[in-house]
Amino acid sequence: MRAADAGAFAQRAAQIVAAMSTRERAASVVMGHIPTTDAASLSSYMTQTGIGGFILMGANIPGDEASLRAITTALTPDPALPPLIAVDQEGGDVARLGWDPFPSALALKNEPAAAAQDAFAGRGALLLRAGINVNFGIVADVAPDASSFIYRRALGTTPQASAERVTAAVRGEASGALSTLKHFPGHGAAPGDSHTLIPATGMSKGEWEASDGMPFRAGIDAGAELLMFGHLAFTAVDGAPASLSAEWHRVAREELGFEGVTITDDLGMLEASGLAEYRDPVANAVAALAAGNDMVLAVMFSTADTAMRVVDGIVAAVESGALPAERLEDAATRVTELRLELAAAGRGMVPCGDCEAVAG
């Protein structure tokens, strides 16, 4: 994207957000979910909540592209400002679209980096055909241990190998769905499954820079548009999970130069840890925004009213001063800018006259 274009989008986003109410700003930074394939229900959900994004899970995916395209159309009330419609389409173990024929990280880690570029070029195009504009698909974690739960999903077993394949994957998706790097600052160093606990490591900042940080720096340099923060703690840097850590957000912005949208991993995972301090999903969302996330993702334990409860909580936090209004404005502006870029690039919905021919 040319600098002049980026400046124009930023200016327009700032104007749009300046005209928003606090509630509209709060809604714009929430990515929600309801488990249905009913287009009318999905359309109503997006219209009533006004949220800025939706994540498609298995319960949202029908058996063919044409039906999925109808769903993503229903999720887009205003094509001029399309929501971020995301999916976890890594390939292999984590793949929502069953008709994805492209190799997963388990195979790609043993192939030249060019294979990762080809796979993610195909995958990104496949998603865009169906109206999915964000892929939570590039696992930038370094996983040398085959017994690690993230091993099969990581693109490399060494920092250099991972960095090469992450770079290739981002370049591959450049004309397809937007790229997301996950799980910053790196799941490989923190043992354990963050779906059920808060993995932790005592790795120092210097050690991280020379190892697990390398693939993220490479992916950012390659142009990844989103960065997903994991619910894992590097205790030598910050005792809090990275998703709630202002310091890790500072590192991403100031040291790695990331200028895109930061988003949490599913906040329901914090609840699933069983720790008392994370049992309130609304408080988790507010804390995540305060730490520097531009968008909060809510899937696990979510119901049809979860998004609005989170929005209400964000509004209340701004009104009480617990969440600075400027932080919410900044987050809403960054998300809105990305949505405007999607609309201008035509990456919200592309022609797909033969969708019916591709089925799972």
What is the meaning of each model-derived region?
Residues 1-52, 255, 273-360:
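Preference for extracellular/luminal or secreted protein segments
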Residues 21, 62-74, 161-323:
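Second-shell residues forming the walls of enzyme active-site clefts
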Residues 27-34, 52-56, 83-89, 134-138, ...:
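Hydrophobic faces of well-ordered beta-strands that scaffold small-molecule active sites
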Residues 32, 47, 51-61, 72-78:
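A short aromatic-anchored loop/beta-hairpin motif
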Residues 101-113, 156:
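A charged helix-plus-loop insertion that forms the helical arch/lid used to bind
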